[in-house]
């Protein structure tokens, strides 16, 4: 909790993104969106391990620079944590760093467990956001809070960059 307190006092070192320093409470925390992953997708052992870890944190708030359950997560911190605790060893990557680890995959070839990448979600060069593709145009990502979301929404379509497959 002390690390979270520091993030709140410093606004995650991004006051342009976090204009207030208040702890969330039940009345201000957004509720996550849930999704039932098709059972056939979970027959893939790597994807099942990824989802076993990833779903533990649904509802956690977005924290700029966060990379563990004790600090909560930002998008790349969340994906890095999930991968490092489900069979990969990628260290702490940025969204661009995660993209660089992947082989690009076409929309026709994307499958559950691939990563999905976006540009222009905030002012930074290169890939700026990432999530885990879970099938049926749905991703699990660290929005605010960690939640499932539909990739067919206008926002995600406007910022979509690529799907990527981990080695």
PLM region spans:
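Residue-level signature of the cytosolic catalytic core of signaling kinases
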Residues: 43-46, 71, 123, 156
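Catalytic cysteine-centered active-site loop
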Residues: 60-112
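Aromatic- and glycine-rich peptidoglycan recognition patches
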Residues: 88, 95, 102-107, 122, ...
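Intrinsically disordered, low-complexity
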Residues: 1-61, 158-167
């Amino acid at each position: 909790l002390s690390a979270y307190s520091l993030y709140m006092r410093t606004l995650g070192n991004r006051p342009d993104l976090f204009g207030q320093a208040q702890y969330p409470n039940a009345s201000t925390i957004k509720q996550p969106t849930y999704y039932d992953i098709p059972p056939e997708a979970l027959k893939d052992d790597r994807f099942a391990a990824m989802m076993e870890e990833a779903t533990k944190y649904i509802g956690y708030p977005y924290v700029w620079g966060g990379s563990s359950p004790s600090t909560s997560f930002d998008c790349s911190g969340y994906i890095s944590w999930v991968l490092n605790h489900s069979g990969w060893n990628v260290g702490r990557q940025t969204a661009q760093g995660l993209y660089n680890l992947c082989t690009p995959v076409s929309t026709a070839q994307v499958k559950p467990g691939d990563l999905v990448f976006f540009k222009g979600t905030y002012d930074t060069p290169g890939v700026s956001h990432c999530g885990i593709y879970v099938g049926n145009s749905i991703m699990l990502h660290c929005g605010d809070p960690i939640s499932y979301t539909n990739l067919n929404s206008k926002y995600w379509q406007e910022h979509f960059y690529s799907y990527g497959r981990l080695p």
